[in-house]
Amino acid sequence: MSYPGLTIINKTITLPDGREIQIETGKLAKQADGSAVVKLGNAMILATVVSAKEAKPGVDFMPLSVDYQEKFASNGKIPGGFLKRESRLSDYEILISRLVDRAMRPLFPEDFHADTQVAITLISADADVLPDALACLAAQAAMSVSDIPFNGPVSEVRVISLNGEFIINPKPAQIEKAELELIVAASYDNVIMVEGEMSEVSEELMLNAIKVAHDAIRTQCIVLKELESAAGKTEKRTYSHEVNDWDLKKKINDAVYQQVYEVAKLGNANKNTRAEGFKAVKKAYIESLPADHTEDLTLIGKYYHDVEKDAVRNLILDERKRLDGRSLEQIRPIWSEVGYLPSAHGSAIFTRGETQSLTTVTFGTRLDEQMIDSAMFSGNNKLMLHYNFPGFSTGEVKPNRGPGRREVGHGNLAYRAIKKVMPPEIENPYTIRIVSDILESNGSSSMATVCAGTLALMDAGIKIKAPVSGIAMGLITDTKTGRWAVLSDILGDEDHLGDMDFKVTGTEKGITACQMDIKVDGLSYDILSQALQQANRGRLHILSEMKKTLATPREDLKPHAPRMIMIQIPKELIGAVIGPGGKIIQEIQKTSGATVNIEEKDNAGWVSIFSKDKTALDSALSQIKGIVTLPEVGEVYEGKVKSITAFGAFVEFLPGKDGLLHISEIKWERLDTMEGVLEVGETVKVKLVEVDKKTGKYRLSRKVLIPKPEQQATSNS
């Protein structure tokens, strides 16, 4: 097919398993600064990038926005809801947007501050291709064919470990069986971002997975550079650089560096006291200036921040001492408490230094499950973790407008850390909502959520496989001297001023989740390895502190917690439990007071019974077991007379199962009439003596349970 006036460029990336990723540019969205379509199988992603020609006055940061969205039409679906159209991004789309943002943001020039938007859209879906692993590749392809200043290329891949092998960009069915799943972002030379979940794996396995992913990304980076050359975009646009006064910068450094260093060296554990100390040095410097000085106060603030950063980093590298006086591996003081909220189904407080989480656990039924309806996925989620970060946690005034992208990301990390140790559904039929409210924050609040969430689950009586703890690691490097220091349990300032934020969660056995963002080039795998080993020691220390509060799950639920059990029944008996028009299941709920749900899954019926008291639960369970229990010849049952005829009575000996008690089987003596023998509703003990092989009808006997008259007479004599 010809495309008059268009210059279309195509490139191909071959995955290790032989599948091919196609990159096409020049056909769609040509008025954007850059656009590209990435295709794998039937999955197609359109990415566009647009950047303003000039930065807005006074902007001293990178105003980058990344939005990933899935069109429902991409998978032949119409959106739900009243409007029937795509609206605000879902949490799933926000998480993918964050993956791309975190990979690309560090690679823009430090002084490039023009508004930049990356829009990534799934326009065709494939059930065997997860689009999140292609989103960054598509965004970089669009960036490569634009003139926007960018120190790329960068790309992302998913890597899993399955049966001892690493697989790049696996199919969903493979991911479900994997013991490790990571999304890794990297340039040709450096790993930039890592995020994923694992089934209690070793640090070595995780490190090897990152290396395999990086090798696959290098192949993609080579093709992306070829794409850039083919598009003629190797030269990027010029832009207005930041205004700097290098003489002023040196003057400020000479005047205040030592004072700032001494404030940092005090090792005060209170962040507000430290902040006041740094502010006092800055204030004194400004007050020392002549009244008629012409120096820019904005530049003074910027350069003073640089001095602060250098002083704190040098303190760590020179004296192996940190802002709050700790050594490099030292963990802040920890205290925790469970059962703090008497009416919650489970609760815990976890405090580490100046970071505190109050976390609750709430039980619900299947009716409380979170409904998921997206272009790629439809279903229900029975485990939820919500993370809240109010302004007061950092002493700030901030309007409460619901969770932002940061809250969604932090909550997802904690969710992935904990879900790996949740018991199987047959042991834990509840829908569970975990809510972490951060009451104080000075670094590692997501890791505090993991610790508090674990304690709250154990307080609630959920039999998790093992308790999980989490720690945030940091890094300070000096490329000139080659010195570096890995920090355990970082403060907010150490995160801000450092070169790495590496969060690791796990049990005593191994890692369950991780999230890493690296801000420095040339980070070696040796340093990563040390960070992982140091994190392991920190995690185990935190875990030991948690166990002092609660080492294992409580034996039983709280007295006020709802009760729920799940039983499996044969698939063919689902209809028997439900009854015609739902009559039987409604009757069970009415008479017992419990809520009963039933569904077919894995070629079996799964019945969940939910109640706020044990009596109602036992009643419903007894009735359901009666329905699904297969009658056995020779067994004795206590039944109820349902109707009486001239030739006998029909007795319900199990719920929904009636048998004929013939007039000849009621007594040993001959009966000519049923009048006055039995009454409807009367309870009678019977024995199942036969099941008709042709009709399946049941024949009951009462007299076989009564001694014969001659036996009775002999006994009496």
From Swiss-Prot:
Record-stated family: Belongs to the polyribonucleotide nucleotidyltransferase family.
EC id: 2.7.7.8
SUPFAM superfamilies reported in the protein's UniProt record: Eukaryotic type KH-domain (KH-domain type I), Nucleic acid-binding proteins, Ribonuclease PH domain 2-like, Ribosomal protein S5 domain 2-like
NCBIfam families recorded: polynuc_phos, PRK11824.1
Catalytic activity annotation: RNA(n+1) + phosphate = RNA(n) + a ribonucleoside 5'-diphosphate
Keyword Secreted: no
MF terms (GO), sorted A to Z: 3'-5'-RNA exonuclease activity; magnesium ion binding; polyribonucleotide nucleotidyltransferase activity; RNA binding
Ligand binding (Mg(2+)): D495, D501
Compartments it resides in: Cytoplasm
Function as written in the Swiss-Prot or TrEMBL entry: Involved in mRNA degradation. Catalyzes the phosphorolysis of single-stranded polyribonucleotides processively in the 3'- to 5'-direction.
Top-level taxon of the source organism: Bacteria
Cellular component aspect of the GO annotation: cytosol
Gene3D superfamilies (UniProt xref): GHMP Kinase, N-terminal domain (3.30.230.70), K Homology domain, type 1 (3.30.1370.10), Nucleic acid-binding proteins (2.40.50.140)
Enzyme class, broadest EC rank: transferase
GO BP field: mRNA catabolic process; RNA processing
Gene: pnp
Domain KH: 562-624
Main location group: cytoplasm
InterPro entries: ExoRNase_PH_dom1 (IPR001247), ExoRNase_PH_dom2 (IPR015847), ExoRNase_PH_dom2_sf (IPR036345), KH_dom (IPR004087), KH_dom_type_1 (IPR004088), KH_dom_type_1_sf (IPR036612), NA-bd_OB-fold (IPR012340), PNPase (IPR012162)
Keyword annotations from UniProtKB, A to Z: Cytoplasm, Magnesium, Metal-binding, Nucleotidyltransferase, RNA-binding, Transferase
Record CDD domains: KH-I_PNPase, RNase_PH_PNPase_2, S1_PNPase
Record-given protein name: Polyribonucleotide nucleotidyltransferase
Domain S1 motif, residue spans: 634-703
Pfam families: KH_1, PNPase, RNase_PH, RNase_PH_C, S1
Organism this protein belongs to: Cytophaga hutchinsonii (strain ATCC 33406 / DSM 1761 / CIP 103989 / NBRC 15051 / NCIMB 9469 / D465)
Cofactor: Mg(2+)
PROSITE patterns with a match to the protein in the record: KH_TYPE_1 (PS50084), S1 (PS50126)
